[in-house]
C-alpha cells in the first residue's frame, strides 16, 4: 500500500506551526516568514518558483524529498486560504497563482465544499467535508500506486497523526520562540513510540527530525 508522508513541516522551539492572527496580508500570522526562511533559501523552493540558485547541504537534501513519488495531496482549508466559514464566492484559487507547485490532485478539507477547481500544470483542488480516513481513501484512489502527502496546516497534520494514518513525518524545528499560534503536538503524548526517530541539526540551528514507521 502507498505511504502517507509529511515533508518540510516547520515548528518553533515551543511547538507552534503557525503564528496567531493569520490573514490575507499575513498568511503565517505574527510568525511572518520566520518558520520557513530555511526553506526559502533552498534550491527546491527557488526552482518551484522558476528561480535559479539556492543553497545545497542538509536543508536542500531534505527539502527535495517532498515531491518524488507523490500522487496526491491532502491539506486543510486554512492552508488553502485565509477565509473562514461559508465561501463568499469561488474567486479565491489559493496562494500559488495559476500554476500551483503540486501537479497532482489536491484534496482540501473543509466544512463548506465547493466545486472542484482545475488549475494549470496538473493540479486540481477538490473540496471535501470528510474524516481523515475518508479523505485518505479518496486521495489514495486518485494517487494510484504513488504516495499521498499531507500538506498541512497543523490542525490537519495533528488529526492524521491522532488517527495513526501517517507513515513518514519530517518536522523542521526552527530556533525561534513564537509564544502563541497553532500548536502541532497537543494531545499526541507518546507519539514517538510508533516510529523510528532520527534527527540532524544544521550549523544555523535548524533541526530536521524524521519519524518513520518501522
Please provide the spans of the model-predicted regions:
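Enzymes that bind and transform nitrogen-containing heteroaromatic metabolites
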Residues: 1-214
Amino acid at each position: 500500500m502507498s505511504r502517507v508522508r509529511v515533508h518540510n513541516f516547520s515548528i518553533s522551539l515551543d511547538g507552534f506551526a503557525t503564528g496567531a492572527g493569520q490573514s490575507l496580508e499575513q498568511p503565517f500570522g505574527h510568525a511572518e516568514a520566520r518558520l520557513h526562511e530555511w526553506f526559502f533559501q533552498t534550491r527546491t523552493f527557488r526552482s518551484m518558483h522558476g528561480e535559479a540558485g539556492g543553497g545545497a547541504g542538509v536543508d536542500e537534501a531534505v527539502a527535495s524529498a517532498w515531491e518524488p513519488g507523490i500522487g496526491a495531496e491532502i491539506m486543510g482549508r486554512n492552508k488553502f486560504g485565509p477565509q473562514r466559514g461559508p465561501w463568499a464566492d469561488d474567486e479565491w484559487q489559493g496562494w500559488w497563482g495559476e500554476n500551483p507547485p503540486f501537479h497532482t490532485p489536491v484534496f482540501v478539507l473543509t466544512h463548506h465544499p465547493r466545486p472542484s477547481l482545475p488549475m494549470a500544470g496538473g493540479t486540481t483542488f477538490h473540496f471535501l467535508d470528510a474524516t481523515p480516513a475518508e479523505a485518505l481513501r479518496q486521495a489514495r484512489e486518485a494517487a494510484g500506486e504513488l504516495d499521498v502527502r499531507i500538506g498541512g496546516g497543523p490542525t490537519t497534520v495533528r488529526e492524521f497523526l491522532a488517527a495513526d494514518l501517517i507513515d513518514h513525518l519530517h518536522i523542521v524545528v526552527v530556533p525561534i520562540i513564537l509564544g502563541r499560534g497553532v500548536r502541532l503536538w497537543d494531545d499526541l503524548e507518546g507519539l514517538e513510540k510508533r516510529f523510528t526517530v532520527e534527527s540532524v541539526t544544521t550549523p544555523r540551528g535548524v533541526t530536521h527530525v524524521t519519524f518513520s514507521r518501522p
